[in-house]
């Protein structure tokens, strides 16, 4: 049919940016020359490792269906996308391993070394945690006790209701049993020749 008429460029292959890779190669060559010449290469100063101040989002895409085509950007494809390292990880455990790993931390500009805490910092942290625990315990004790009392009351009510229902059921069974015996005696069916006495 119309093989050349009105078609757009449907080439989905990745195009390499030659200029960018040329610059990287030149940079690597200059570093190698400096090593050979005996000049020490300046080590990159990295920050000490610090904790995250945000929550890692693992559940926003959970249960959603996404249509993926060849033109879909990598960040929207299946799995967890790391925008710092520009990579996709397929499951949450590997994603957590990745964001806690060396490569990711290096791309963030941090080393894997942790700042050494001083004695004062440790004491302050203990005080803060102790205050939190005391506040939590006070709230927890009162709320928990009230909850337990309510549950005990509900159980006692349910137990009483069950006993009353059983009492009623037994009384009804006794009445129907006695009526059946009387009816059988009137009709002449009492006992059917058994020697066992009914009480």
Swiss-Prot record:
Subunit structure, interactors included: Component of the spliceosome B complex.
Coiled-coil residue windows: none
Zinc finger (Matrin-type) boundaries: 80-104
GO biological process, one term: mRNA splicing, via spliceosome
Region described as Disordered: 27-46, 150-175
Keywords, alphabetical: Acetylation, DNA-binding, Isopeptide bond, Metal-binding, mRNA processing, mRNA splicing, Nucleus, Spliceosome, Ubl conjugation, Zinc, Zinc-finger
Domain of life: Eukaryota
Entry GO MF terms: DNA binding; zinc ion binding
Compartments where located: Nucleus
InterPro entries cross-referenced by the UniProt entry: Matrin/U1-like-C_Znf_C2H2, Snu23, Znf_C2H2_jaz, Znf_C2H2_sf
Name the UniProt record assigns to this protein: Zinc finger matrin-type protein 2
Compositional bias of kind Basic and acidic residues: 150-173
Gene that produces this protein: ZMAT2
Gene3D superfamilies reported for this sequence: Classic Zinc Finger (3.30.160.60)
GO annotations of cellular component type: nucleoplasm; nucleus; U2-type precatalytic spliceosome; U4/U6 x U5 tri-snRNP complex
Residues found modified as N-acetylalanine: 2
Covalent cross-link site, Glycyl lysine isopeptide (Lys-Gly) (interchain with G-Cter in SUMO2): 8, 36, 39, 45, 55, 61, 64, 70, 102, 123
Function noted in UniProt: Involved in pre-mRNA splicing as a component of the spliceosome.
Entry-linked SMART domains: ZnF_U1
């Amino acid at each position: 049919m119309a093989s050349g008429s009105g078609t757009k460029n449907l080439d989905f292959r990745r195009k390499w940016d030659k200029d960018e890779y040329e610059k990287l190669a030149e940079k690597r060559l200059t570093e190698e020359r400096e090593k050979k010449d005996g000049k020490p290469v300046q080590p990159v100063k990295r920050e000490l490792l610090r904790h995250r101040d945000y929550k890692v989002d693992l559940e926003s895409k959970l249960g959603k269906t996404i249509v993926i085509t060849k033109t879909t950007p990598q960040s929207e494809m299946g799995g967890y996308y790391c925008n710092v390292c520009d990579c996709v990880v397929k499951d949450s455990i590997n994603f957590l391993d990745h964001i806690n790993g060396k490569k990711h931390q290096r791309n963030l500009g941090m080393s894997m070394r942790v700042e050494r805490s001083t004695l004062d910092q440790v004491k302050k942290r203990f005080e803060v945690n102790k205050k939190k625990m005391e506040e939590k315990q006070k709230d927890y004790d009162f709320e928990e006790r009230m909850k337990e009392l309510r549950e005990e009351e509900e159980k006692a009510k349910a137990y009483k209701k069950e006993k009353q229902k059983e009492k009623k059921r037994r009384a009804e069974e006794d009445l129907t049993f006695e009526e059946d015996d009387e009816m059988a005696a009137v009709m002449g069916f009492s006992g059917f020749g058994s020697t066992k006495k009914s009480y």
